[in-house]
Amino acid sequence: VTAKKQWPVDDRDGFAPALLEFLRELGLIGTSASEYGGPDELLLQSSGPISVDSNFTSIAGPPIIRITSQQPSRLRQPEAISNGSALQGEINLGGPQSTCDWRIEQWEEGCKWNKRVTVEGNDLSSALREMNHLLPDLDSNLKGLQPGCFAGLLTYDLVQWTEPVQLHHLPPTGALLGLLLRVDRWVIHDRSKGTISVLSTHHDEWFEKCCEGIENWLITPDTQQESLAEKSSLDSTILDEEHSAIVDTVRRAIRDGQFYQLNYGRIWSGRLQDPWGVFKRLVATNPAPYSGWLSVPDYDYSLASVSPELLLSMNGNELSTRPIKGTRPRARSRGRDLALKRELAASRKEISEHMMLVDLERNDLGKVCAVGSVRWHDWRIESHPTVHHLVSDVRGRLRDDLDGWDALQALFPGGSITGCPKTATIAAIDELEATPRRAWTGSLGFYDPRSGLACWNILIRSLEAEGGLSGDWLGKVQAGGGLVFESDSLQEVEEAKWKAQALLDAAWGSSASKIPQGEMSIEPVPLLNSVIEALHKSLNTKPQVCISPAEPIEWRTGDPRFVPVNEGERRLLFIDNLDSFSWNIIHGCAQLGAEVIVVEGRGEKSSAEVQNLLSAIMPTHIILGPGPGWPTNCKLTQQLATLALKGEIVDSDKDPIPLLGICLGHQAIGEAAGWKLLPSPNGAVHGVTVEMNFENDSLFARMESPQRMMRYHSLIVEPTGRQLKVIATDAETNSLVMGIAHPDLPVWGVQFHPESCGSADGWKILENFLVTANSAFGQSVEMPLLGREG
């Protein structure tokens, strides 16, 4: 039974850091607590206005067991051999060459951390799942965060075991990749209830002394604020001019179709005396709901973060992620501050960036959530002390056969700090930044496999400090922003500085007087134009009754063959071309009653033999999915498009199998017909809802024209022959080809994305396609509008 004691307490500024300092002085936390456990310190702090996001603050007591991961040697995990530029679509695909290793370590009283055993896994989730046996039994009498769970740091560089891409710039051998404490002792401040609790797996001496100390401290708590940082020298990895040139380089890659959005970050660094003082200044001047402090003395490492962003929240099987994308600085005058907030809400660029991330996070949750459960739930403007942000809430229900480690594997690292499509941008980030990110854009948080409770932030607004044995630390701050085709290079340079400024001031006293401060608030995105009105309508549409869908199946060469479908059933072969929206299409089709078989279209596991693939799966329908780059990067998609136009994609009765290409798949069909593929003459358009003119075609049955659909593309097909007919164009110019069809065969392509939150009736296109087959006649199926909830 968990030992627990609780006291009433009010909510005051500086409460948690002051309490942690007091427990240090008593020898109950940190380097002076060696008789009770290790010297590692962890504080997960929620500050700012009390809300669902900012409620609990938790201080970990001295740990007895921890697990750590270090960068393998270059012999085990070599850097990728360059075969070209990711900015030109040449990505080193493939899994890691070494296992993801974690060391289980135990504290020897008053001494040091000793290694017990090393656990290996092929990816991050499988390695961490092997640690579940270390946890004590759960106390069924308690709810919420309990002692005995895992909590700590996952650096961005663990991406080596979460994404199928090989990197050129790896951390040095032995560098800390991850550290999770088994937290057997918690001090928890429940801000909404006004209580502070001490919880421990044992009613021991530490528990007694901690309770006694807190009782005495609460009589006259000392919460003095930290003095301002002294001004000191600061270095940047690049000049503003170089940063501006990188923005232009990314814009060219987007124009060429390699990706839609990329998050680039630059680094500032300098010597500092006390990372803990930096953290106290940060939480005082920039309170945020997902702040945190970590100290690991044997690695000479500290981390201070005031992150406002949530990667993953889990309660039982309910998952939530809250991507942030879209930023404006605060202003000193109220009028100018409100104008900047409205400017943010009215910006086509900022809205498009944000919608890309909403669709991306729906996709990532879709990898592990039950079909029909993923939805865009909320959209708002959050005003923090120095910036305004656009924030959404995307939710889903975890599948019964998966756990929180699987959910973390699917979402880590967050899409808002990589880009879209995710795998392609991770490769390009590695090329452009040319250095490992370490903790920045990784995650700090906790997970309890026993209760299914988890919360992981995204480590933005963070400072890392290393090498402080003599009090001389090297601190590092990284900040940047999402780059899209419409980005202005000078504005992007300034935005990176806004985001870094509060940290630079707290650490090095760089320019305190220049930072406007404002009150924190959360408000709905105002209805300023027809685009926002349409998105709000989509967000607030009530879901309809969903049929009972089958979960999608990921199939690889060598897996068991399928038996033929029964009369009237539909089996969809979906070719996944490494896009970050693929699972939205997969879920949409599964909701419509199709059995969806997912096959990789790029990379090591892509099937090269088309006829063997078709005979093994025996599909009734095929979708060639979207993806980064050009169709030439996707050989399987090219082959299927070519054979479909020849009438050689047929079922066992020699009837043609209906085939639909979406975005890149649409372009592959156009190229197979001999049409030209070239950059759009009107420029790249990503994350923007645009009106489309539809012709009278079965693919658009029961749909009005014009119709708003979401565009994500830089390239466009240009007709050069009559093998295909144009069935959709953009309403603005009526010249850009947005839909094609073969006049005699069941082959279609659409350039836009029907599965997006910005395509309110796009599901009807998927439905119309799936009811097109000799073996699948019948009434159309009603389904929920994809990814939305009222």
Regions found by a protein language model. Give the residues of each.
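Extended alpha-helical targeting/anchoring segments
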Residues: 1-543, 549-550, 554-559
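Short, solvent-exposed loop/turn segments that connect beta-strands within catalytic domains
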Residues: 74-76, 468-473, 652-655, 734, ...
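Flexible loop residues that form catalytic
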Residues: 267-268, 468, 627, 745, ...
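Active-site flanking residues adjacent to catalytic metal/cofactor-binding acidic residues
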Residues: 358, 575-576, 752
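Acyltransferase
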Residues: 534-560, 755-790
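A short, charged/proline- and glycine-enriched loop
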Residues: 564-571
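Flexible gly/pro-rich beta->alpha loop and the following alpha-helix that scaffold active-site loops
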Residues: 571-575, 579-662, 667, 673, ...
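Pocket-forming structural segment of enzyme catalytic cores
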Residues: 639-662, 667-764, 768-772
